[in-house]
Amino acid sequence: MAAIRDYKTALDLTKSLPRPDGLSVQELMDSKIRGGLAYNDFLILPGLVDFASSEVSLQTKLTRNITLNIPLVSSPMDTVTESEMATFMALLDGIGFIHHNCTPEDQADMVRRVKNYENGFINNPIVISPTTTVGEAKSMKEKYGFAGFPVTADGKRNAKLVGAITSRDIQFVEDNSLLVQDVMTKNPVTGAQGITLSEGNEILKKIKKGRLLVVDEKGNLVSMLSRTDLMKNQKYPLASKSANTKQLLWGASIGTMDADKERLRLLVKAGLDVVILDSSQGNSIFQLNMIKWIKETFPDLEIIAGNVVTKEQAANLIAAGADGLRIGMGTGSICITQKVMACGRPQGTAVYNVCEFANQFGVPCMADGGVQKHWSYYYQSFGSWFFYCYDGWYVGRYYRITR
């Protein structure tokens, strides 16, 4: 019988072992030895937990220049992401990509709904004239969904501010022929042009009003802050927002045909933050040309290209200017590419190989498809830097997320 070792030497013994338990990620994902692995083809060995869960940060790069607080996005499918899902994905620290299975105008309209849900400084507020009737003001409430409007001397933006009208001013007025100037709040509290967003929010807290109107030195209306946006900030402090406008971040998908160029123009005009080039095979001359055109036409727009499953595919898209990659072929909830075309790659191997390559160029990746159970997240995240793009998994949880 072997001698019993001193328990104090247990750690020293592990250091002298020829190799640690299990396989390294490089050994596990060696395609020459193991071919391709799906998520349920392996398990992750446990290790030492020497930190509290509160110390864990899920902050992850979506693209070269966009960072979110959670590594979750919703897929650009017509059964998954429209304006409501995109709004709540952004509020809950992720991002949603609005599908393009609709007219360009309808897609741009969905985009505007997301963008208008929350604002920083509202630089193009809807204003009315002092000679507008109460009846017309009530109609504007029904049209826009709110009843608070700045009143300027000529009813135009960037004109002399003469008052403000709210729902309280007109709620009990029965004579709809009265003019706004007869019922409006005169001399509303204002902020001076140049105040910061945080300074403006502090004023809103003190005055306990629905809006803060910002004017220049001549008293002309410049912009506006809304109390409802302040309340949204308190409820969703980590919401995904544009660094410039403080509006919610959102993305959208387009195809790679010439007709998609005009669609993209409409989306950019509506405030697009990041675009997905939606294709099951991203390594095509059509997508490469589209990436180059976008970079020339809209150099500040972030592009997520794909889908890819190999390093060679990734290399072409990175060289063309992609700011992020989407990984997966035949692994989505309704995708049948592998069965019909005998083309694709098991998602575990695809994710590791593409991420390992793309990370060398600072290009983040997202795994698209293959999530069947909650533990699939852990498989996706080992040794890699990327997001999870969910489609069918989200559909059954839609009301839980958005309600």
From Swiss-Prot:
Native species: Saccharomyces cerevisiae (strain ATCC 204508 / S288c)
Gene: IMD1
Catalysed reaction equations from the record: IMP + NAD(+) + H2O = XMP + NADH + H(+)
Positions with a binding annotation for IMP: S333, D368, G369, G370
UniProt protein name: Putative inosine-5'-monophosphate dehydrogenase 1
Cited SMART domains: CBS, IMPDH
InterPro entries given in the database record: Aldolase_TIM, CBS_dom, CBS_dom_sf, IMP_DH, IMP_DH/GMP_Rdtase_CS, IMP_DH_GMPRt
Catalytic residues as annotated in Swiss-Prot or TrEMBL: C335 (thioimidate intermediate)
Similarity-based family: Belongs to the IMPDH/GMPR family.
MF annotations from Gene Ontology: IMP dehydrogenase activity; metal ion binding
Source species, domain of life: Eukaryota
Intracellular or extracellular location(s): Cytoplasm
Domain CBS: 121-183, 184-240
Matching Gene3D superfamilies: Aldolase class I
A Pfam family it matches: CBS
Binding sites annotated in the UniProt record for NAD(+): D278, S279, S280, G328, M329, G330
